[in-house]
Amino acid sequence: MNRLWLLVCVLVSMSSCISSKMIANNMVGSMDDMKTSFFAEESPTYARQAGPALMKMLDGFLVSSPENVALLSRGAEMNCAFAQTFLDDHDRTWAQVMYKRGKGYGMKGLSLEYPGLAK
């Protein structure tokens, strides 16, 4: 009986991980729509306030699917664009964190897409 419960727990855990990855992988189109909406926002104040939440959501998708090149590309673009647009002049420390994260996402995506690039 204990083995049965262990098997059930393992299967439930595995299905949760698989479905999280599937959801993340299917979010690329939605992230593109959100990115378009973000860059088209007429209120810079609203865009600045919404940006961190959008990027945290993208970070969460990358936790579920860390080798998704499309999501890594969006992460690189969004983090660097946010840093340049909203942080460079006002908060250099935060800007540097965002640039570093964006660069990390970009380099990881490139190394996955072009395996010999890092050598």
Feature-to-residue mapping (PLM):
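Sec-dependent N-terminal signal peptides
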Residues: L4-S13
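Bacterial Sec signal peptide processing site at the extreme N-terminus
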Residues: S13-F38
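Short coil/linker segments at helix-helix boundaries
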Residues: G29-G60, S64-E67, M78-K119
